[in-house]
Amino acid sequence: MKYSRFFLHQYLKKSLVIFLIVAIVTCLYAPTNAYVLPGPYILKLMTQNLGKAKSLLVSQTLVIHDDTLQKSGVELSETLRYVFPEMFRSDTLSEQVNRIHVLSKGKAVTVIDGKVADESDNRYDRYKNILLFKPGKMLQDKLSLLGVDATVSSLGRFQGKPAYVLGAQYPDETTPQVWLDKDTFRPFRWIMTSKPEQSRENSLEVRYLEWQKFRNTWYPMRIEFFMAGILVREIHVQNVKINPSFSKKLFDIKHLKSLYPQGPPAEQEQENKKDLNEVQKTIEDFKKLYE
């Protein structure tokens, strides 16, 4: 009888240990299966969290890294102007390049070295979309046009931290998706996957880092761009001014097009790139990426 009680006690003890182990493991992985807030509601909380500024003036440095990983990057000074919820202008000025990009109420134009570029939008310009478009419904519509289905949401982890994933079921990273900090609802990762017929190496990942609060508005002080896991460019913000006043002409696309002629076709641009040194080629490649 004593032996039976002893074995029963041992059995129950082992069963309890196994139960506790299973419970702990379940808790560790629960975030990926727990209840998830609806994507549109997450975007609403995100835009509310970023603040209520009416406009922003941002001074920053854009660093373009050489793809060979052996040479130092090219640094360019940029000035950004945000007028919420849907007007934006960036001015890139240096001895090598002069670039203006304007987005105003759904229309866009890019001027490079005094000439209007063939194309007015590209994915390197899109990083500002998450910071610009408000309210959440407007941002949801803009993300949808870029392949992010915000009606799909899940919980995941990135570098050990829990996060909301919009546009995919974690851990799937093959579709366009936006990641937000689970506690603050601030975005920190945007994966822009390439088209199915293109190589995955062409997918672009943008990371929003070092968020800082300016009065009642949050802004990332560092933004990184990765292709195939390689850092190809980064943005370092020096200053952010809240609610500055801007002339409406700065965002007048029709007015800008009247000031600058149409640039040469792409074929002519390729011909012009011959016999350039490495620094010039880097700048020309930068211009080409933004056309």
Question: How does the language model describe each region?
Answer:
Residues Y35-K115, D149-T151:
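N-terminal mature ectodomain segment of secretory-pathway/periplasmic proteins
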Residues V63, P85, L93-E95, K105-A108, ...:
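Solvent-exposed coil/turn segments that connect beta secondary-structure elements
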Residues V36-L37, Q159-K254:
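Gly/Pro-enriched, hydrophobic low-complexity segments
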Residues I253-E291:
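Gram-negative outer-membrane assembly/targeting C-terminal domains
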Residues M1-L12:
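N-terminal secretory signal peptides that target proteins for export/translocation
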Residues S72-S77, M87, D121, R126-L132, ...:
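Subset-of-secretome marker
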Residues A34-K44, Q48-K52, K107-Q177, K182, ...:
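Flexible, processing/modification-adjacent segments and terminal tails
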Residues S15-C27:
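Bacterial N-terminal signal peptides
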